[in-house]
């Protein structure tokens, strides 16, 4: 009962906040508001320097692999089983999935910096 009440309250609060943001008036963005500000001086270099998409893809790949390894480390405690073959097989399955996804990224040149 408490979980359902908390879930319903959080859902209603999130919906209320979303509705309020859509009802609020959109502020006009003047040219002065969109320009970068450097202590009262004109900016020396452009404020929005584009970065390489390869860097973004490598960062996302790192986050995914880091998350999967974070799931792999507590696996023996999470399963809490006396069935050792089941734990070993599930760990090996996760490692095989990690290896196959790394090989796929490598073959698709997702980790290649030169182009």
UniProtKB/Swiss-Prot annotation:
Q: What InterPro entries does the database record attribute to this sequence?
A: NADH_UbQ/plastoQ_OxRdtase_su3, NDAH_ubi_oxred_su3_sf
Q: Does the keyword Mitochondrion apply?
A: yes
State the reactions this protein catalyses: a ubiquinone + NADH + 5 H(+)(in) = a ubiquinol + NAD(+) + 4 H(+)(out)
Which keywords does this chain's UniProt record carry? Electron transport, Membrane, Mitochondrion, Mitochondrion inner membrane, NAD, Respiratory chain, Translocase, Transmembrane, Transmembrane helix, Transport, Ubiquinone
Q: Which GO terms describe its cellular component?
A: mitochondrial inner membrane; respiratory chain complex I
| Record GO biological process | mitochondrial electron transport, NADH to ubiquinone
Topology in the lipid bilayer:
Multi-pass membrane protein
In which broad location class does this protein mainly occur, judging by the first location in its UniProt entry? Answer: mitochondrion
Task: Supply the Pfam families for this chain.
Answer: Oxidored_q4
- Listed transmembrane segments: 3-23, 55-75, 84-104
What GO molecular functions are on record for this protein?
A: NADH dehydrogenase (ubiquinone) activity
**Where would you find this protein in the cell?**
Mitochondrion inner membrane
> Which EC numbers does the record give?
7.1.1.2
Q: Which domain of life is it from?
A: Eukaryota
Q: What does this protein do?
A: Core subunit of the mitochondrial membrane respiratory chain NADH dehydrogenase (Complex I) which catalyzes electron transfer from NADH through the respiratory chain, using ubiquinone as an electron acceptor. Essential for the catalytic activity of complex I.
How does this chain assemble? Core subunit of respiratory chain NADH dehydrogenase (Complex I) which is composed of 45 different subunits. Interacts with TMEM186. Interacts with TMEM242.
> Family per UniProt?
Belongs to the complex I subunit 3 family.
Q: What protein name is recorded for this chain?
A: NADH-ubiquinone oxidoreductase chain 3
Give the source lineage, highest ranks first.
Answer: Eukaryota, Metazoa, Chordata, Craniata, Vertebrata
